[in-house]
Amino acid sequence: MAYNLPDRVIKEITAFAKENSIIKIVLFGSRARGDHTERSDVDLAVYGGDFDSFYWNIKENIHSLLSFDVVDMNSRVTEELKKEIERDGVVIYE
């Protein structure tokens, strides 16, 4: 289990990233820090590509009890969130 996520979920995220020309995905939040619980959501910062298609692929096609919070880093993002991602984030796709 890499990045505190099941390997199957990482493979699905990677496949959707490739399909949608995503440049980079950063895991952030409690799962990146390692202080998550089994009910913690999965926070993903997404750079480049077709964000909308990627977002819907994640929401509709990953068969897991995990919930996902997916942030488009190409849109307006608060400085506070950017700093959190830079501080705690782990690149899971590039």
What are these model-derived regions, one by one?
Residues 1-24, 32-38, 47-94:
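Catalytic core of pol beta-like nucleotidyltransferases
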